Curated annotation (Swiss-Prot):
Gene Ontology molecular function, alphabetical: fluoride channel activity; fluoride transmembrane transporter activity; metal ion binding
Annotated Pfam families: CRCB (PF02537)
Sites where the protein binds Na(+): 76, 79
Cited HAMAP family: FluC (MF_00454)
Membrane-spanning intervals of the chain: 11-31, 34-54, 66-86, 93-113
Function description: Fluoride-specific ion channel. Important for reducing fluoride concentration in the cell, thus reducing its toxicity.
GO biological process: cellular detoxification of fluoride; fluoride transmembrane transport
Name by which UniProt lists this protein: Fluoride-specific ion channel FluC 2
Amino acid sequence: MPSQDKEIDKIFLIGAGGFLGAVCRFLLCELVEGQLGILSVNVIGSFMLGMIMYDTEYLGFIGPKGKIAFGTGFMGAFTTFSTFAVQSFSLPFIPALGNISANIFLTLTGVFFGRSVIKALSSREI
């Protein structure tokens, strides 16, 4: 039973994080509408997830439960690849290419900067 309790704890952490992530995404997309809203969500999310993933490896500030709650739950609900894909598909060809390029470049840049913040804080080479 202890193993089953740990799984239930993980599911609860993911669900609670997911709830908060979905609410935050909704609020940000209300503030910044359309493709720019989804781009903002995905770039911010990539930056934060980059920090979370590298923190758990190099600083250890967040810990395993935080990684589950924030990395899997919150970020999983906050970011949205599927909405980005649907929006891109619904645009004319040239604007779609711009949206796709911006999302890919800026989200990878977000991860890079999230990693860089953790690298600077840890003073260790990644």
